[in-house]
Amino acid sequence: MTLNLCVLTPNRIVWDSEVKEIILSTNTGQIGVLPNHAPIATAVDIGILRIRLNDQWLTMALMGGFARIGNNEITILVNDAEKGSDIDPQEAQETLELAEANLRKAEGKRQTIEANLALRRARTRVEAINAIS
């Protein structure tokens, strides 16, 4: 038995295919979803989506949003998403280093919050690459 997974951003469909299992980062922690999972709606945190296709695991960096799970259908609506295999490792590492530097230089509450969010997004992209290596 499989699940139909659809990952959408405002600009595109990132994934629309059958999967065996997913592990999703939510605002309350990670959840695993197998076929016949109880219906839920949840907020999606900035984090990694792990997707199992048979014996192979893929990763995707998700940048926060919402998910609806029910009747073996998973719909994830996020601000942005990238497959781990599509992320350039060098560019992701450079972005992470820049985000860390920007956080150190941040002045005031607003700049600190924005720098922390940028750092979380950058770390998630690097984690998505490292999870598939």
Swiss-Prot record:
What subcellular locations does the record give? Plastid, Chloroplast thylakoid membrane
Gene3D superfamilies membership:
6.10.140.480, F0F1 ATP synthase delta/epsilon subunit, N-terminal
Q: Which GO terms describe its molecular function?
A: ATP binding; proton-transporting ATP synthase activity, rotational mechanism
Q: How does it sit in the membrane?
A: Peripheral membrane protein
- Give yes or no: UniProt keyword S-adenosyl-L-methionine: no
- UniProt subunit comment: F-type ATPases have 2 components, CF(1) - the catalytic core - and CF(0) - the membrane proton channel. CF(1) has five subunits: alpha(3), beta(3), gamma(1), delta(1), epsilon(1). CF(0) has three main subunits: a, b and c.
Functional description taken from the UniProt entry: Produces ATP from ADP in the presence of a proton gradient across the membrane.
Q: Indicate the family of this protein.
A: Belongs to the ATPase epsilon chain family.
Record's protein name? ATP synthase epsilon chain, chloroplastic
UniProt organism field: Eucalyptus globulus subsp. globulus
Q: What is the lineage of its organism?
A: Eukaryota, Viridiplantae, Streptophyta, Embryophyta, Tracheophyta
